[in-house]
Amino acid sequence: MNWDLRTNAEDGSQRMLNALLPGTVVPAHHHPHSSETVICLCGRMDEVCYDSNGHETERFHLCPADGAYGCQVPAGVWHSVEVFEPSVIFEAKDGAYGKDGSELM
């Protein structure tokens, strides 16, 4: 479930809260023209990065209770999440959802 934080549909950015449960599947994807800021507000999860062949290259542990609040996923990097406990994240990037050139792996 996500909550769009933009003030109107013409806003050219993506800012949202995203609630994720353990077992949530987010297909690996990338944003070719924008980096993505991910801030974990509660819960515990990993942001997982991949190369273009689908091999894991980096993993960011996100858990505010551990002092690990967020990460920056560079433009063009394939990524997904692994959720370990109910979590809420804030996500921000350039380009409106569905209109930013994002692609699934």
Where are these regions (language model features)?
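A generic "binding-loop/recognition-motif" signal
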Residues: 24, 33-34, 77, 85
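A short glycine-rich, His/Asp/Glu-containing loop-to-beta-strand
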Residues: 1-28, 34
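Extended, positively charged loop/linker patches that create polyanion-binding surfaces
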Residues: 52-72
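Double-stranded beta-helix
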Residues: 54-61, 78-105
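Short beta-strand His + acidic residue motifs that chelate non-heme Fe in jelly-roll/DSBH
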Residues: 28-29, 47-49, 71-73, 79-84, ...
